């Protein structure tokens, strides 16, 4: 959880096109941050809702269908049949099904729109028709969405085995995760290091994909057979750890290739420091905080693994530390304002709520391990 899952979360909230486009649609940076933070708090409820439904389904099926093994992918429709339909309320099954389909379409249409936008502007307009009008771009985007819908449907039919015991969500997530490690590195290195080049970013993306697919079988054939590594990570490497390893190699590839290629002076200024988001001193402070936090998280994880620390204690320590790292700058500004006779409210600062969100997520990570 502290390795590849962190990389995946950085991708989802910081580099995912259909999340980023929502932030870019905000009127101001503050509203964009507020929207992301609000969505983050709502996201924290999903595990409780999904896990709670799964636990309820387990006991319902054990009582009504004893001895029958129910796959996770069929649990929800069976709940509709066994619980919702017998309630006898007209239209209730349709209402629940409509809510499920609406939630699916809400995510799918964002993904399709994002994919069509990327292909239309980054490929079609850049390489095929630089003089394309808005009407032409809209037409191409609509055609691409139709092609992708049909293609995804055919791909699903080809890869999904209804008789498999593996959850389809896990299957998709394991393959999707192999594509994002290098993307996160390309964004992060590009924003933090002025020496990064486009070739370095491209190299990190390719390296991330190649290593993600190679590391699992290589581990299984080598380190997975040793007692030390099989005891820590198992004989088969979880794809979360594979993403983390791929991200490390992607960073190395980005640095090496960037050193070997010529950087664009104008684009080199488009970093956090160059844009004035951070000063060099504040950026070093941020990197120090992140490094110390990761070391603390790893230490707490090790103590839990050795059964030295209980989950509740580890969760409280990690979440408190996380929140303090966020609001440290806010507390300093409040003290400065107070010394000058001005009154500021801590709860009006988005870092306060961002820190609280991060603290809640870290607490759940350790408490529910």
Where are these regions (language model features)?
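Membrane-embedded helix-loop-helix hairpins and adjacent transmembrane boundary segments
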Residues: 1-369
């Amino acid at each position: 959880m502290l390795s590849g899952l962190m990389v995946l979360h950085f991708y989802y909230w910081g580099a995912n096109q259909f999340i980023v486009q929502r932030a870019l649609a905000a009127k101001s940076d503050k509203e964009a941050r507020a929207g992301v933070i609000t969505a983050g708090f709502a996201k924290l409820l999903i595990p409780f809702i999904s896990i709670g439904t799964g636990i309820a389904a387990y006991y319902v099926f054990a009582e009504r269908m004893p001895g029958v093994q129910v796959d996770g992918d069929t649990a929800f429709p069976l709940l509709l049949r066994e619980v919702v339909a017998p309630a006898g309320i007209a239209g209730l099954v349709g209402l629940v099904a409509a809510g499920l389909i609406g939630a699916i379409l809400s995510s799918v249409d964002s993904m399709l729109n994002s994919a069509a936008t990327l292909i239309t502007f980054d490929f079609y307009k850049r390489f095929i028709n630089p003089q394309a009008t808005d009407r032409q771009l809209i037409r191409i985007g609509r055609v691409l969405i139709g092609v992708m819908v049909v293609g995804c449907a055919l791909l699903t039919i080809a890869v999904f085995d209804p008789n498999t015991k593996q959850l389809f969500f896990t299957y998709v997530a394991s393959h999707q995760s192999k594509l994002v490690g290098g993307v996160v590195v390309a964004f992060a290195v590009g924003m933090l290091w002025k020496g990064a080049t486009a070739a370095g970013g491209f190299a990190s993306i390719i390296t991330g994909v190649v290593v993600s697919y190679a590391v699992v079988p290589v581990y299984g054939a080598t380190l997975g057979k040793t007692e030390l590594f099989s005891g820590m990570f198992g004989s088969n490497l979880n794809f979360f750890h594979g993403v983390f390893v791929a991200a490390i190699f992607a960073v190395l590839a980005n640095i090496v290739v960037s050193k070997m290629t010529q950087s664009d002076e104008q684009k080199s200024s488009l970093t956090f420091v160059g844009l004035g988001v951070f000063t060099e001193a504040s950026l070093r402070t941020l990197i120090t905080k992140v490094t110390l936090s990761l070391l603390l998280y790893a230490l707490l994880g090790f103590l839990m693994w050795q059964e030295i620390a209980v989950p509740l204690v580890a969760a409280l320590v990690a979440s408190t530390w996380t929140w303090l790292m966020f609001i440290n700058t806010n507390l300093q500004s409040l003290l400065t304002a107070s010394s000058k006779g001005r009154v500021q409210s801590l709860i009006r600062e988005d870092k306060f709520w961002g820190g609280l969100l991060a603290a809640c997520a870290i607490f759940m990570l350790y408490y529910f391990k």
